């Protein structure tokens, strides 16, 4: 959540260190929980995205949203694609040529990524998986009744507490 707020408020964009992954059986409400994060503005969330970092349209679609849920990550990315995904999600900016533009433009990243998976063994990367922060979900309540605007205000307050920027993992957390 801190990464989401940093993506929204950091003027120079933000390089996120990883993505939160909910792993659990089908039908628990993992995607619905992510949808609740931006329930007050549906245009801020892209749910069930299939992202191809090599495809400009896929990238443009993803980074046009504040929060992107990569649905069913294990079926979207092959083992060879995971390194590209890790590099993409941690990038601070995106270089794109929009339709009808003559030149490429560098856009500061304003997007935070989340993912959901069903199978526990979706990570098969021998080089390490520190970019994927996995939470095993056995039960989740997407209808929790929490005021999401208030929640985001509190997250922002925590992020910029006394002028500090606290969204990066500490050495111990890595």
Language-model segments: which ranges?
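Feature primarily recognizes SF3-like P-loop helicase cores of small DNA viruses
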Residues: 13-18, 45-46, 54-70, 76-89, ...
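P-loop NTPase catalytic core of nucleic-acid-dependent motor ATPases
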Residues: 1-63, 67
């Amino acid at each position: 959540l801190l990464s989401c707020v940093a993506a929204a408020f950091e003027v120079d964009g933000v390089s996120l260190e990883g993505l939160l992954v909910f792993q659990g059986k089908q039908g628990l409400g993992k995607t619905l929980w992510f949808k609740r994060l931006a329930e007050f503005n549906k245009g801020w969330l892209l749910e069930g995205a299939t992202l191809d970092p090599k495809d400009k349209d896929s990238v443009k679609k993803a980074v046009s949203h504040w929060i992107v849920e990569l649905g069913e990550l294990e079926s979207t990315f092959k083992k060879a694609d995971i390194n590209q995904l890790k590099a993409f999600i941690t990038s601070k900016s995106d270089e794109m040529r929009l339709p009808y533009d003559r030149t490429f433009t560098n856009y500061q990243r304003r997007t935070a990524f989340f993912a959901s998976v069903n199978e526990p063994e979706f990570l098969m990367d021998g080089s390490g998986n520190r970019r994927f922060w996995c939470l095993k979900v056995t039960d989740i309540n997407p209808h929790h009744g929490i005021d999401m605007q208030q929640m985001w205000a509190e997250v922002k307050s925590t992020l910029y507490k006394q002028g500090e920027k606290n969204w990066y993992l500490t050495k111990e957390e890595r």
